[in-house]
Amino acid sequence: MNICRFMKILVRCFLCVTSLVLLLLPEVVLAQAPSEEASKSSTSQVWQVAVDGSGQFTLIQEAIEQASSGDTILIKAGTYPEDVTVHSKENLNIIGEGRDRVFITGEKRVGSLHIGKWPYGATNVMIQGLTVTQHGGLGVGIFNGSGVHLKQIHVKGMVFIQQVQGVYLEDCIIEGSETTGVAFANSTGTLVGNTIRHSDHGVAIGGNSEVTLRHNVIAHSLFEAVLITGQSKATLVQNTLVRNGGGIAFRDGTVATVRGNVIGFSAVGLSFSAQSHTTLAFNALYDNQANYLLEGTPPTPIPERAGKTDVVLAPGFVNPQEDDFRLRHDSSLLHIGDFSYLGALPPLSLSK
């Protein structure tokens, strides 16, 4: 009888302990979760590259190969004559001391800087504060991947983007390409606040791409500032396209929305294929030999493709002879439609 009672008590104790463990287990797991996340975030590292040996590496490529996802690479001032490739990396930041202090000049390969390489891409990689000089006609090549962000870099040559989603170019200077300044092939991206100059074409959007351009200055292109071909889609809002062979060319079956731009001092303002689809509004055209042309042999004027709210007005640039395309405070391009000003750059009264 005593043995039976003892067994019953033992079973009850076991059940109580088991219930208590089950009740406390979620709290234990939750208590451990933040520490695990903190452990993961604490593993992100900062690497330094310096040609004088004061960093952990003297070559940028060595630092990239060592870095893991989430790391940051800081590049000290100097010239780096090497071929740099970033691929199979996520959330990597590469930051130079400034585009007037850090120079990647390439060595043997076509393209001094590659982000992604077939079949490997790169995801959410940000590169900032350096200059890349073209090698073999290509400055920067971006292949595959997504979320590549170039900020405040100077590219002396072409930026070529192929099969990449969500590319973002911000406050960059791109110039001196032997072909195109920025070329998109079957990619999506956004260009904001860049200066693109002295190329054959400023920006070429081809294949099945979708690209937005806002507040860019594109000047001194041998041909069009922006060329859109294939089945691509483009949105251009408040850009200044001046001193080019042409402003914008809409080829093939392209679709585009074009609003608030300044297009001037060119042979042709806007050139259309018969198959293209465009929505134009509040664009200012000035001092072009022709504003709206239909492609053909020869091209013919097509004023019916103009936006109903487009204007033909002198922009009132500060000093166009010196490529200062800011607007004067008395510019005629202020407060037009829903824009406080047309073009890429604010008037002097609004400039900082």
Role assignments for model-derived ranges:
Residues 3-17:
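Bacterial N-terminal signal peptides that target proteins for export
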Residues 13-27:
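Bacterial N-terminal signal peptides
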Residues 46-79, 85, 331-335, 347:
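Acidic Gly/Asp/Thr-rich repetitive segments characteristic of extracellular carbohydrate-active
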Residues 61, 66, 81-95, 103-147, ...:
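Extracellular beta-strand-rich solenoid/capping regions of secreted or surface-exposed proteins
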Residues 75, 82, 86, 96, ...:
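Extracellular beta-strand solenoids
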Residues 83, 110-114, 138-139, 158, ...:
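Structural detector of coil-to-beta-strand junctions
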Residues 95-101, 123-134, 147-157, 165-180, ...:
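Right-handed parallel beta-helix
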Residues 304-352:
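C-terminal accessory segments
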